[in-house]
């Protein structure tokens, strides 16, 4: 395994492991159960045909838990947009096409997105909500419709890679089952409100904000055109999307905004 990472995210680093494989090493503090969950979800995604990337199981390196995957030779959709800004509409549409492809897969082997969302209400990230508010949010989420489509829950251009033969979706650690509208609502929320990487300058935040708005417009236009999800569906899942975003990631700079959004969603009923 290489000594320097070839990619880095919020929770893990990726290292080359020979020519054909990579090791995704979680940062210290990520427990073995979380990694085991990602192994199971990644293997299921491959089994269902929604990713060609094979998962070769878990490893431990210097006390850090990790996973061995096939190495893919491609670039993320974000890089496509960065190389040619005129391709932003195409990138947004491609993102929708790949999301629809994921949602055509169905399973009874993943947890229900509604129960995962309700479970987040007991995490420290959601502690700003009062007990009465948490109960109200839980009732709202449990009243949402059931489903068995595969949902990704972290679907954005950096998790879709463009290869010569096809596009590939990566990072299945948050995969669940449910209504596709839940997943699309999370992607919409990510484009609208998610924090950019720390250290991004004010001028670049303006640029990235404009890019996000363009990508979101073409992503939603393409996804909604399929007719399986409506804007009203996305709005109904908005409160669950905020709970999932905050509970699963707990990004400090997003806490106040997500809590305020949850309260606004409750008040809008």
How would you name each of these model-derived features?
Residues 104-153, 163-164, 168:
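An alpha-helical support segment within catalytic cores of ATP-dependent transferases
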Residues 73, 155-157, 174-175, 186:
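Short, glycine/acidic-enriched loop or turn micro-motifs at the edges of active sites
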Residues 158-162:
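Hydrophobic residue at the +6 position relative to the catalytic HRD Asp in the kinase catalytic loop
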Residues 4-111, 145:
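ATP-binding pocket architecture of kinase catalytic cores
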Residues 24, 38, 154, 171, ...:
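Acidic active-site catalytic centers that drive phospho-/nucleotidyl reactions
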Residues 166-212:
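Active-site Asp-x-Gly
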Residues 191, 198-269:
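Helix-rich C-terminal or lid/interface subdomains of diverse kinases
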Residues 20, 66, 148-150, 167-168, ...:
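Hydrophobic "anchor" residues on beta-strands that sit immediately upstream
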């Amino acid at each position: 395994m290489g000594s320097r990472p070839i990619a880095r995210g919020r929770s893990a680093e990726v290292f080359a492991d020979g020519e054909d494989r990579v090791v995704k090493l979680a940062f210290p503090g990520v427990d073995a159960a979380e990694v085991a969950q990602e192994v199971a979800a990644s293997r299921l995604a491959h089994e269902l045909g929604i990713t060609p990337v094979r998962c070769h199981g878990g490893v431990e390196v210097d006390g850090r838990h990790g996973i061995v995957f096939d190495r893919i030779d491609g670039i993320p959709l974000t890089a496509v947009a960065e190389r040619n800004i005129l391709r932003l509409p195409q990138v947004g549409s491609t993102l929708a096409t790949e999301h629809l492809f994921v949602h055509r897969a169905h399973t009874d082997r993943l947890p229900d997105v509604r129960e995962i969302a309700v479970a987040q209400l007991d995490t420290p990230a959601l502690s700003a909500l009062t007990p009465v508010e948490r109960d109200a949010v839980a009732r709202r989420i449990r009243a949402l419709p059931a489903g068995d489509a595969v949902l990704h829950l972290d679907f954005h251009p950096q998790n879709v890679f463009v290869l010569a033969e096809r596009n590939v979706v990566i990072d299945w650690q948050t995969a669940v089952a449910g209504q596709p509208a839940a997943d699309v609502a999370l992607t919409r929320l990510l484009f609208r409100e998610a924090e950019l990487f720390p250290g991004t300058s004010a001028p670049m935040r303006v640029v990235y904000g404009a890019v996000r708005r363009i990508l979101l417009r073409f992503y939603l236009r393409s996804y909604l055109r399929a007719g399986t999800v409506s804007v009203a569906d996305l709005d109904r899942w908005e409160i669950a999307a905020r709970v999932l975003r905050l509970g699963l990631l707990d990004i400090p700079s997003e806490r106040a905004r997500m809590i305020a959004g949850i309260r606004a969603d409750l008040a809008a009923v």
